């Protein structure tokens, strides 16, 4: 039942890296984990408009290094760096630790599954047809070099009485192949009929190199 598992769960340590890079003793682990969740939620809520698909947190003693991936880094940095300075001060006040922020630009947001899911959810909230939003996202991703993309929308689609799930896909999206670079994203659209869930899987190709064939000389035996 590999199709039921979060794509990152299978691939962490194989083709995906950890989003939290720190080690803690058993008694400290719960507090640090809760602090991580608070940091992620705060950054995501404050900078949602900048398009934040990924936040990587690295800890060392009394210092926290946070890598923020953004589709619109200018919105995070602000005029003359005021935005990022204000964010750093707020995070330091929240954690009582030294915070180092690193803003990384997402070059192709159309190939980021999380950003695609958030974009579709935003369009559904604006009463744009979910089918149109899904098909446009698929066309853009395939045009920019994706090997495959799958999108699923669940809920009371178009205000229907009975909730259902509709899926569209193009290309190849292998869920069992660990060497496949599968990006996964999830977002929710809040409509007058209730929440609509949007899931996106994007296949960016294979990561691990193919094994080289050994060529042996026939002579010299």
From Swiss-Prot:
It comes from the Bacteria. One of its GO terms (molecular function) is structural constituent of ribosome. It holds the Pfam family KH_2. CDD domains: KH-II_30S_S3 (cd02412). Residues 39-107 form the KH type-2 domain. The keyword Ribonucleoprotein applies. InterPro entries: KH_dom (IPR004087), KH_dom-like_a/b (IPR015946), KH_dom_type_2 (IPR004044), KH_sf_prok-type (IPR009019), Ribosomal_S3_C_sf (IPR036419), Ribosomal_uS3_bac-typ (IPR005704), Ribosomal_uS3_C (IPR001351), Ribosomal_uS3_CS (IPR018280). Keywords: Ribonucleoprotein, Ribosomal protein, RNA-binding, rRNA-binding. GO terms for cellular component: cytosolic small ribosomal subunit. GO terms for biological process: translation. The keyword Ribonucleoprotein applies. Binds the lower part of the 30S subunit head. Binds mRNA in the 70S ribosome, positioning it for translation. Belongs to the universal ribosomal protein uS3 family. Part of the 30S ribosomal subunit. Forms a tight complex with proteins S10 and S14. NCBIfam families: rpsC_bact. This is Small ribosomal subunit protein uS3. The lineage of its organism: Bacteria, Bacillati, Bacillota, Clostridia, Thermoanaerobacterales. The gene is rpsC.
């Amino acid at each position: 039942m590999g199709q039921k598992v979060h794509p990152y769960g299978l691939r962490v340590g194989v083709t995906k890296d950890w989003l939290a890079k720190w080690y803690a003793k058993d008694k400290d682990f719960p507090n640090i984990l809760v602090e991580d969740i608070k940091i992620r939620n705060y950054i995501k809520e404050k900078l949602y408009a900048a398009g934040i698909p990924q936040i990587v947190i690295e800890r060392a003693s009394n210092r926290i290094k946070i890598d923020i991936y953004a589709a619109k880094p200018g919105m995070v940095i602000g005029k003359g760096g005021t935005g990022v300075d204000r964010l750093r001060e707020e995070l330091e006040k929240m954690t009582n630790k030294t915070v180092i922020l690193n803003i990384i630009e997402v070059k192709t947001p159309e190939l980021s599954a999380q950003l695609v899911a958030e974009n579709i959810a935003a369009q559904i909230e604006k009463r744009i047809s979910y089918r149109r939003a899904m098909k446009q996202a698929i066309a853009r991703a395939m045009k920019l070099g994706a090997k495959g993309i799958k999108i699923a929308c669940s809920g009371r689609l178009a205000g229907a009485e009975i909730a259902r799930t509709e899926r569209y896909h193009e290309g190849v999206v292998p869920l069992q192949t660990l060497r496949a670079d599968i990006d996964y994203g999830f977002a929710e659209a809040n409509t007058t009929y209730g929440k609509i869930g949007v899931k996106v899987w994007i296949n960016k190709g294979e990561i691990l190199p193919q094994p080289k064939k050994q060529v042996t000389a026939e002579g010299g035996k």
